[in-house]
Amino acid sequence: MNVIEKISVVMCSYNGEKYIRQQLDSILQQTYPIHEIIINDDISTDKTVDIIKEYMIRHDNIHLFVNSKRLGAHPNFMVALEKASGNYIAISDQDDIWELTKIEKQIACIKGYTLCFSLSRAFGDGVEAYTECRVPNTNVFRLLFYPVIPGHAMLFERSVLSHIPKTDYVVYDLLLALAANLFGGIVACPEVLNLHRRHNSAFSYSKPKNYNKSIFNVFNY
């Protein structure tokens, strides 16, 4: 008999009224049961919170938290991750679309590892999009210098969070990938299971000043 794992989906929202319905629908329609959807809103000024509350009326596994002050993308995710209660956590961007078998296939892949990532295909609204269907190099030395595994592609054991240091200098998905690599291992699910939306208001990654020094310091290297 197959054990049904408790899956927490963690999403951070901010002014996502245009796309968040599509992503919530793709999560709620997953072929694998979703224990809870944790949404941490960073004080949206549009109708994002109202839309989420509409979904909460129909789905009691959606839990909304609204920050008392703006945190920004990375601190917001770190706060949201701590609220997850499932033994596995999947990260969701508010404007992506999941393939309906995403969680089912990642759960099948992750056994024996602490983090599984899928491939993503980007699409855009009026901006140049790309397709990334290659499995990246997840060697720890490669991970030290660039987050080759985006958070929106991850499913990981909750235990990984206990190995993440508190820092404002390193992005959350890089911290997760490094911790999983060092404590249990990373495996790829080599299928495109996430459609990653690219648009002019989407968050983009840039390295902070003194990044290379910071990444070694937070893991005490």
Range-by-range predicted roles:
Residues 97, 101-130:
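Conserved donor NDP-sugar-binding/catalytic core segment of glycosyltransferases
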